[in-house]
């Protein structure tokens, strides 16, 4: 629990986390928790920054308060897998890393011919520890609207203060900045991929970037 309470606010914990009864343990809602927790109570030499990590892991979420048509199917589920990225960096570099991280997600989706846009969260929509957050949204031809497929956040030194992640260098000792980004969550990516590459006859066009991994196939044809 010392990691969980350090990486997120109480409101987020209540809405997301599954606690194991009788244990001081939680199921992770994102591998950000495990990766940031790696640096708990550490002093990092400034010349070893940035620290960049990525992880593909199972994720578990209660999704309290979720409702509506999007909650059916694979859009919002209690167990899924996700590729996450985190950065621990110098305070003056966090803005640069923030822009670089969300751009990774945008580039990935656009490489698969999925239209995406970014939406900067207003201050009232930010979780307590976040300095800035951007949602990456993909176009849904079925719903005729964009829906969230990823999120990138700059936590400033908020997580670092809670978890005692410090930097030492010529400027003395100070708190690092931390950031996280959802590269891809396969369930939502699959929705966006199928809807934007589906042909009228039920076949699915394979984007060029994926063809080398599909034996050179250009189209997936349904079995009748």
Regions found by a protein language model. Give the residues of each.
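TRNA-recognition modules of translation machinery and tRNA-sensing kinases, especially anticodon-binding
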Residues: 1-224
């Amino acid at each position: 629990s010392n990691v969980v309470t350090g990486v997120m606010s109480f409101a987020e914990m209540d809405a997301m986390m599954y606690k194991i009864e009788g244990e001081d343990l939680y199921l992770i809602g994102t591998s950000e928790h495990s990766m940031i927790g790696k640096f708990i109570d550490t002093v990092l030499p400034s010349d070893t920054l940035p620290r960049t990590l990525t992880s593909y892991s199972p994720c578990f979420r209660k999704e309290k308060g979720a409702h509506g048509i999007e909650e059916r199917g694979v859009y919002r589920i209690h167990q899924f897998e996700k590729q996450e990225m985190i950065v621990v960096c110098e305070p003056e570099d966090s803005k640069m890393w923030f822009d670089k991280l969300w751009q990774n997600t945008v580039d990935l989706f656009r490489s698969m011919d999925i239209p995406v846009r970014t939406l900067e969260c207003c201050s009232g929509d930010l979780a307590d520890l976040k300095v800035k957050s951007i949602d990456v949204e993909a176009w849904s031809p079925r719903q005729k609207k964009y829906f969230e497929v990823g999120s990138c956040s700059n936590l400033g030194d908020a997580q670092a203060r809670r978890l005692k992640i410090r930097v030492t260098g010529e400027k003395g000792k100070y708190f690092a900045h931390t950031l996280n980004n959802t590269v891809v969550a396969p369930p939502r990516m699959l929705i966006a991929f199928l809807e934007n590459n589906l042909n009228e006859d039920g076949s699915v066009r394979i984007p060029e970037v994926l063809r080398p991994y599909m034996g050179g196939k250009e189209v997936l044809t349904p079995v009748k």
